[in-house]
């Protein structure tokens, strides 16, 4: 079952601290202003807070340039990392699996049985045992993926819209901290050494680099990424229509292809990477809405929400991030004919 509280994050934690006499809290250090503000608020109370940056691919001192010299274009960053052969450090070994611990707040929390959350159509069916949360399930999923031939075909399948095998599906466990980017890389390296090293396996590393790059962009620019014009790399005006945003959010636009994506997101909390880009482009370019509203909606819906990846990807699409071409404007008809030529995805959700 899933235990949850509806409360301000810090207020909720402090209630637990007081009730159960907790004297220390351990957490991930995230370079985003809301998360940093939460740390500051917690440190102002009688509880020791220990925050660690451990979700990245590299340690801070491995990055081959000062933060203010971080390239504003991903390709320059990637080439610098690869030319200097910067490699992630090996993750700490997992000596023993952590057994599930019964929550100390069961008597006060609401419970949702997984059977009530069954989404058989989802590309990430959380009601299936192998898609459950937690370190053990995440690590088992990681092992299973790299014990298959899926890594060797990843680049060919990664843009598909349906099914559970077209992409790695690591993101929910990565976003929750159950597995780390360094663990993924360690499995990838072993796969390349013992099975096959090809363009597809490189592309898994390529996507890990994107994730790392967006984390560094957040560290470099801080709150600026949330501004209307983002990083200011485009002078395009930012408009907004509340009416159009509601149509998009509820999956009631003039495009059933877009509606299918928005319904999948709302019903399951998951969406393929390709579809995320398509619906984002549609909101910004066809419906003339503020990209930050779309980013906020994704934040409220995604089971794999990651502040850096989410907001940087939205800014990128809108032309207010790190895209040197000033954003991406997808031709929706072409996207549909390429990725859903027979209308199977559209029929599944609409």
Placement of each model-derived feature along the sequence:
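Trp/Phe/Arg-rich N-terminal binding region typifying the photolyase-homology
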Residues: 1-89, 94, 263-264, 309, ...
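Short secondary-structure transition/capping segments
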Residues: 16-21, 46-53, 96-110, 321-327
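Active-site-proximal binding-pocket segments
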Residues: 163-350
């Amino acid at each position: 079952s899933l235990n949850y509280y509806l409360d301000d994050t810090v207020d909720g934690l402090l209630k637990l601290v007081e009730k159960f006499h907790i004297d220390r809290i351990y957490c991930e250090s995230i370079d985003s202003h809301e998360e940093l503000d939460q740390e500051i608020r917690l440190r102002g109370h009688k509880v020791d807070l220990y925050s660690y940056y451990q979700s990245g691919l590299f340690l801070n001192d491995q990055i081959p340039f000062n933060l203010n010299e971080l390239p504003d274009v991903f390709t320059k960053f990637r080439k610098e990392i690869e030319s200097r052969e910067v490699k992630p450090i090996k993750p700490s070994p997992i000596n023993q699996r952590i057994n599930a611990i019964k929550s100390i707040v069961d008597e006060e929390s609401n419970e949702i049985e997984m059977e009530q959350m069954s989404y058989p159509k989802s590309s990430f069916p959380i009601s299936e045992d192998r898609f459950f949360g937690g370190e053990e399930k995440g690590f088992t999923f990681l092992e299973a993926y790299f014990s298959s031939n899926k890594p060797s075909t990843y680049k060919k399948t990664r843009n598909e819209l349906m099914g559970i095998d077209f992409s790695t599906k690591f993101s929910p466990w990565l976003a929750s901290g159950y597995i780390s980017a360094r663990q993924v890389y360690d499995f990838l390296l072993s796969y390349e050494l013992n099975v096959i090293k090809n363009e597809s396996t490189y592309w898994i590393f390529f996507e890990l680099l994107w994730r790392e790059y967006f984390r560094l962009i957040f560290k470099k620019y801080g709150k600026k990424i949330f501004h209307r014009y983002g990083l200011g790399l485009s002078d395009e005006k930012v408009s907004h229509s509340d009416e159009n945003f509601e149509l998009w959010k509820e999956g009631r636009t003039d495009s059933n292809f877009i509606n299918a994506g928005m319904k999948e997101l709302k019903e399951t909390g998951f969406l393929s990477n390709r579809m995320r880009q398509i619906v984002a482009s549609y909101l910004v370019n066809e419906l003339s809405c503020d990209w930050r509203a779309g980013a906020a909606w994704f934040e409220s819906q995604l089971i794999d929400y990651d502040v850096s990846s989410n907001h940087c990807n939205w800014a990128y699409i809108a032309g207010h991030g790190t895209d040197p071409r000033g954003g991406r404007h997808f031709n929706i008809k072409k996207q549909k004919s390429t990725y859903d030529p027979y209308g199977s995805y559209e029929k599944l959700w609409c």
